Amino acid sequence: MADVTVEVRGSNGAFYKGFIKDVHEDSLTVVFENNWQPERQVPFNEVRLPPPPDIKKEISEGDEVEVYSRANDQEPCGWWLAKVRMMKGEFYVIEYAACDATYNEIVTFERLRPVNQNKTVKKNTFFKCTVDVPEDLREACANENAHKDFKKAVGACRIFYHPETTQLMILSASEATVKRVNILSDMHLRSIRTKLMLMSRNEEATKHLECTKQLAAAFHEEFVVREDLMGLAIGTHGSNIQQARKVPGVTAIELDEDTGTFRIYGESAEAVKKARGFMEFVEDFIQVPRNLVGKVIGKNGKVIQEIVDKSGVVRVRIEGDNENKLPREDGMVPFVFVGTKESIGNVQVLLEYHIAYLKEVEQLRMERLQIDEQLRQIGSRSYSGRGRGRRGPNYTSGYGTNSELSNPSETESERKDELSDWSLAGEDDRETRHQRDSRRRPGGRGRSVSGGRGRGGPRGGKSSISSVLKDPDSNPYSLLDNTESDQTADTDASESHHSTNRRRRSRRRRTDEDAVLMDGMTESDTASVNENGLVTVADYISRAESQSRQRNLPRETLAKNKKEMAKDVIEEHGPSEKAINGPTSASGDEIPNVPRTPGEEKTKNLKEESTQEAAVLNGVS
């Protein structure tokens, strides 16, 4: 601020020293020396520039001079106008012009100077220009020492930063300064930014130096990471280094990228070791027996993937036979793993345990094979353990013969073969089957006796329909009755069959729950046959509708039409149709309830086939 010095006229006529702070349209903002007066704006006509410093001091008697003095002790010294009255050596007797003529004072030569010839300032006496300061440089520009070289280059009287307008103020008494400021301002701001960056780096280096000196006596570890593993050690966007720095007690981590060396400093050995575990990545291999490689990998790599996930390694590679980078033992295949030291240790434990398990299992399997071989040599029956070996067609459980209910080997094709055999069987076989089926439980196992759409329903009135055909005078509505006594009788009768039909009864017992086509042939009293002797689905539907209508009729209507229904049943089995379950007389006589031998039945059928009309498919003539 001392660079732009002016003299401000006081109320007593003396000129006091001041400094220009800002230039306005018609005034100056002035700060007084030692702040004896507050900062204020002074008009141009009360301000003048001081005389040049190299002015010659040639003073003689009678000259007007200016005396550096003060009116009282409370005011500072100022330049007062006076006149020299006498000279004696270095002392001068002066008379103040502003005071009475009687007020004289003796002063020394140093307090005197010739009268200042400078006039009061005008509007074009001082020039001011401004430069906008970027936000990142405002703090640096607040220091006036940063503009020392710039001030000298442009010839300014003063350069300072104005915080309210965020601008640099350049004050000068020369108009050429404004042109130079416009030329050099950008360069000046760039130089400030560069200096600021260098100063910041120097400060960081100084702090690092101090920190290094302090850490030299603390705990530290140093390790080297291979160049191809450096990316894993650093982590994505330096995540591993950041994680290591967050370990409590770690003070600094340094990395020399040229040599791949990490240096960790900490307050304790445990903290340094823990931080090292995050960044120290290594590659190691484990030898696996060749015959166990497939089992170690697992189906679709499931086993080796589980080992990798649990251990924490990041990569696994199996070295090929044509690669000789690693030492290889006979009959062994190297598995190469990449990860931290801790994860490599984990994978070694997991893999060694799994290999030991596989070897033990292989040993047990070999012992089993030896035992089986010894059993075959002795001649005993084959051993059937709980392994995964195949079972032959003659396999037995070893605990007795297979029961009828525990033999699950019958397939759907065997059932169809059985049905086709029965459809082509003779009348004697059908009669035997008819007698056996009539003794079964009418509703099937665990099924309702109402004869609905369930799987056990159609068998409910099987034997009763045959009895109606043989005895038309009987009550046809007995088909709807299913008493407990009938079930008991059927159950008793079903247990008295001959042992020669044991296999066939076992098959039929398993298929009783399914509504098969053969059951429809023996059960229906109205169904017609096709060329192969099979009953169609339409026949089942018509029979179910007929039975449903019979059940829904009122009791009075049922009692009234009993005899008519019996006659209809007899007429349906007249000479116009072929009988399903046996031959009928050509004259339409009632069927005698007399049993015939199988030979008589066949002879009777041959005679009737020559005289009766050929049956049409589905019973339509």
Curated annotation (Swiss-Prot):
Domain-level remarks: Disordered region at the C-terminus undergoes liquid-liquid phase separation (LLPS) for the formation of a membraneless compartment that stores mRNAs. The tandem Agenet-like domains preferentially recognize trimethylated histone peptides.
Annotated segments matching region CC2 domain: 353-379
CDD domains associated with the record: KH_I_FXR1_rpt1, KH_I_FXR1_rpt2, KH_I_FXR1_rpt3, Tudor_Agenet_FXR1_rpt1, Tudor_Agenet_FXR1_rpt2
Composition skew (Basic and acidic residues), residue ranges: 553-576, 598-610
Keyword Cell wall biogenesis/degradation tagged: no
Identification of the protein by name: RNA-binding protein FXR1
Description of how the protein assembles with itself and partners: Homodimer (via CC domains); homodiremization is required for FXR1-network nucleation. Interacts with FMR1. Interacts with FRX2. Interacts with TDRD3. Interacts with HABP4. Interacts with CYFIP2 but not with CYFIP1. Interacts with EIF4G3; promoting translation of target mRNAs. Interacts with ELAVL1. Interacts with CEP63; inhibiting 'Lys-63'-linked ubiquitination. Interacts with PKP3; the interaction facilitates the binding of PKP3 to PKP2 mRNA. Interacts with PKP1; the interaction may facilitate the binding of PKP1 to PKP2, PKP3 and DSP mRNA.
Region span, Disordered: 381-530, 545-621
Cellular compartments annotated: Cytoplasm, Cytoplasmic ribonucleoprotein granule; Cytoplasm, Stress granule; Cytoplasm; Cell projection, Dendrite
InterPro entries with a match to the protein in the record: Agenet-like_dom, FMR1, FMR1-like_C_core, FMRP_KH0, FXR1_C1, FXR_C3, KH_dom, KH_dom_type_1
Residues the record lists as Asymmetric dimethylarginine modifications: R447, R453, R455
Post-translational modification: Phosphorylation at Ser-420 by PAK1 promotes its relocalization to stress granules and activity. Phosphorylated by MAPK1/ERK2, promoting subsequent phosphorylation by GSK3B. Phosphorylated by GSK3B, promoting ubiquitination and degradation by the proteasome.
Record's function text: mRNA-binding protein that acts as a regulator of mRNAs translation and/or stability, and which is required for various processes, such as neurogenesis, muscle development and spermatogenesis. Specifically binds to AU-rich elements (AREs) in the 3'-UTR of target mRNAs. Promotes formation of some phase-separated membraneless compartment by undergoing liquid-liquid phase separation upon binding to AREs-containing mRNAs, leading to assemble mRNAs into cytoplasmic ribonucleoprotein granules that concentrate mRNAs with associated regulatory factors.
Compositional bias segments (type: Basic residues): 499-509
Species, as recorded: Cricetulus griseus (Chinese hamster)
